[in-house]
């Protein structure tokens, strides 16, 4: 195990380490039901994709250009919303992500805000696409 990974494990909660190291949600979801993108002041960028079935969020995937903290926040958001109704998912806040991770550094709280902001954009996109179903035929990016 390299020194950087050992340092992360020593400085962070088990939840943080788990969420920061996951890669199973990385990637572009083909024909997403919702898409959101945010670029943070720090330069981190997240593109977030939603798959919704029966008004429940079935899957969240994302692409990130950013730090380990942003990856941890994105995986946490996905964990918190997958399986929930779209309406209920609007209740997820950056504070929920911050609290779940337990050891997200306070000076990286903006990572949770960035991820949740992209998620809200994806929810808005999903709602707009449902109203204008012809839009789903076009690539979102």
Segments the model singles out, each with a brief description of its role:
Residues 1-30, 35, 53, 58, ...:
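C-terminal binding/interaction regions
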Residues 30, 46, 69-70, 86:
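Short, flexible micro-motifs
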Residues 56-61, 71:
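Short small-residue beta-strand/loop micro-motif enriched in glycine and branched aliphatics
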Residues 69-84:
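Alpha-helical support elements that line or immediately flank enzyme active sites
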Residues 44-54:
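Short beta-strand elements
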Residues 64-73, 111:
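Short, thiol/selenol-centered motifs that function as redox-active sites or metal-ligating centers
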Residues 29, 39-43:
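A short catalytic or substrate-binding loop motif that flags glycine-/basic-rich loops and adjacent residues
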